[in-house]
Amino acid sequence: MTPHVMKRDGCKVPFKSERIKEAILRAAKAAGVDDADYCATVAEVVSSQMNARSQVDINEIQTAVENQLMSGPYKQLARAYIEYRHDRDIQREKRGRLNQEIRGLVEQTNSALLNENANKDSKVIPTQRDLLAGIVAKHYARQHLLPRDVVQAHERGDIHYHDLDYSPFFPMFNCMLIDLKGMLTQGFKMGNAEIEPPKSISTATAVTAQIIAQVASHIYGGTTINRIDEVLAPFVTESYNKHRKTADEWQIPDAEGYARSRTEKECYDAFQSLEYEVNTLHTANGQTPFVTFGFGLGTSWESRLIQASILRNRIAGLGKNRKTAVFPKLVFAIRDGLNHKFGDPNYDIKQLALECASKRMYPDILNYDQVVKVTGSFKTPMGCRSFLGVWENENGEQIHDGRNNLGVISLNLPRIALEAKGDETAFWKLLDERLALARKALMTRIARLEGVKARVAPILYMEGACGVRLKADDDVSEIFKNGRASISLGYIGIHETINALFGGEHLYDSEQLRAKGIAIVERLRQAVDQWKDETGYGFSLYSTPSENLCDRFCRLDTAEFGVVPGVTDKGYYTNSFHLDVEKKVNPYDKIDFEAPYPPLANGGFICYGEYPNIQHNLKALEDVWDYSYQHVPYYGTNTPIDECYECGFTGEFECTSKGFTCPKCGNHDAARVSVTRRVCGYLGSPDARPFNAGKQEEVKRRVKHLGNGQIG
């Protein structure tokens, strides 16, 4: 039986003794040894050793040759062979992917790596250190940790193993809802400091900033504080009581008015400091913390004050140029009877949120009733769009804070459609095969966290961020079981998938094609529900944001299938279930088109609309928000808020394949402009940190969602 040789790239090839003989002869020539018979004898001896086995690797063969030569009469030949092997190893290493990727980072020539994440400034040293660590982590995971078929599927573009630069090399998870309430009320240890419960709102927000930085350095996805207005309200009360005590001690007239005024100022300043802190922090991951604040449901004076402070600070902007803050992402909850309609007690806060959205794009909105209907309970998304399902503790209480998502594997749906060549039956068969592979990949994420001790991330597991206080040697995997954590199957390109399968008519214009798109997502949902039942883990379906993936999948498919009209010809794939960005429809019809998908993909979703400048037409924006309240759980507003510091222009810069330019004066100096775009579920500043080529092309093609030039 001929043994197989395991090559360095993982491929298996038949063993050939001729290859050994050729290598020895080359070394003999270099050493000045003219003895072909001896070389052939060495090759035969080594071959006989290898033939006794079913599988060998390259290193074993080379070591056997070296040993044989060292025991022979030609020591210079042995030395020449060893040197030859060493030189080949060096040349191979230089040509290898790891070396090439490191060189691309050092020389700043690998644009795909440098622009992969719009939140990472690849020009600065901390980010470059993170990117370097990511290159090594990816390489090690591909070579030593992940199953070969999973790696090959990722490399081909059948699936995408998200955040391979962090996991599974490190036992990290994706995104989470921090249990801020538990940490602030019970106290915790961070570094060398014992943190006691704060005694004022200013201290509470300062501690919150440190918690965000620590947590964001221990996970690779988004960090969310759920219902922050209600969580921090007691610390506003603490501040009020301090100011009231001061007024009484100094016998200040109108002590009540004084205390409220001082508290309002302190609260505003506290959230201003928090916003600046978040936008100036750099985590160990080489980026600004990707943090989300959920708020809007609090009814107390203190909660309302926090809501107003968050919004007014965002409206004010950052620095002397009043630049739009990218983080925190703001998510404002709307609930009928609270702040939805005129006459509701918090309706004035909604008006402030509308003003803020028109000027700063955030907040996005969570429609309370729809969120409960789709996900089973109300909560803020983790990161930009990942939603937890319902989970109850041993006391039957619904728990959200302290829970997390373990990671995502996304399917390349357009590729399956291209492989099916218009055959719908073949598509469904291939889809089932890819689903089995995706499940295998997702299970590696779970397996990586088994046996991990709490001491690897004290802030998460020992100090309360995950809602638990484990001991250093406790196994963390228990808190991820029985649906407490989610783990998600993602997908991309429903629009291109339908085009590849059926061609012709636009998906939006055909009820039959719409049904086909929904059927695909229904099949994905059936799969994750089945996996959840079979494993007990919280598998969910997630509508992948696709910042980098929209470019990567399309690029790989173009190389494999060529430029296919309606599929690969644009240079990007459409995010998840979203309407084609070039399709001009009014915002209400876009909401109607996308509304069937969140109930199916309830592990992650967002809907949004593109608008002109609506700062002077807030009633029109409110009309769309109100329409969304009845139809979708989570809605975002994209409006032109670019600014030119040369000529004073505010509005929308011209987007080209190369960047952004002021339409009034032609300025495109990144230091003299502010350009803000929604990357996927969050905002980015592409003037300072460019998008990848696919995302830039997608942004360039976006049209405004207007009906006959009007909203409302």
UniProtKB/Swiss-Prot annotation:
Q: Which UniProt keywords apply?
A: ATP-binding, Metal-binding, Nucleotide-binding, Organic radical, Oxidoreductase, Zinc
Q: What protein is this chain from?
A: Anaerobic ribonucleoside-triphosphate reductase
Q: Which GO terms describe its biological process?
A: 2'-deoxyribonucleotide biosynthetic process; DNA replication
- Which residues are recorded with the post-translational modification Glycine radical? G681
- Which SUPFAM superfamilies does the record cross-reference, listed alphabetically? PFL-like glycyl radical enzymes (SSF51998)
Residues the record lists as binding Zn(2+) = C644, C647, C662, C665
Question: Is this entry keyworded Membrane?
Answer: no
Family that this chain belongs to? Belongs to the anaerobic ribonucleoside-triphosphate reductase family.
Q: Does the keyword Nucleotide-binding apply?
A: yes
| Coiled coil (residue ranges) | none
Reported function: Catalyzes the conversion of ribonucleotides into deoxyribonucleotides, which are required for DNA synthesis and repair.
Gene of this entry: nrdD
Q: What positions does the domain ATP-cone occupy?
A: 3-92
Q: Which organism is it from?
A: Salmonella typhimurium (strain LT2 / SGSC1412 / ATCC 700720)
Q: Which CDD domains match?
A: RNR_III
Q: Which reaction does it catalyse?
A: a ribonucleoside 5'-triphosphate + formate + H(+) = a 2'-deoxyribonucleoside 5'-triphosphate + CO2 + H2O
Q: What is said about its interaction partners and assembly?
A: Forms a tetramer composed of two NrdD and two NrdG subunits.
Q: Which GO terms describe its cellular component?
A: anaerobic ribonucleoside-triphosphate reductase complex
Q: Where is the Glycine radical domain?
A: 583-708
Q: Looking at the record's lineage, which domain of life comes first? A: Bacteria
Report a single Gene Ontology molecular function. metal ion binding
Q: Write the Enzyme Commission number(s) for this entry.
A: 1.1.98.6
**Which InterPro entries does the UniProt record give?**
ATP-cone_dom, Form_AcTrfase_GR_CS, Gly_radical, NrdD
Q: Name one Pfam family in it.
A: NRDD
Q: How is the activity of this chain controlled?
A: Activated under anaerobic conditions by NrdG, a tightly associated activase. Activation involves the formation of a glycyl radical at Gly-681.
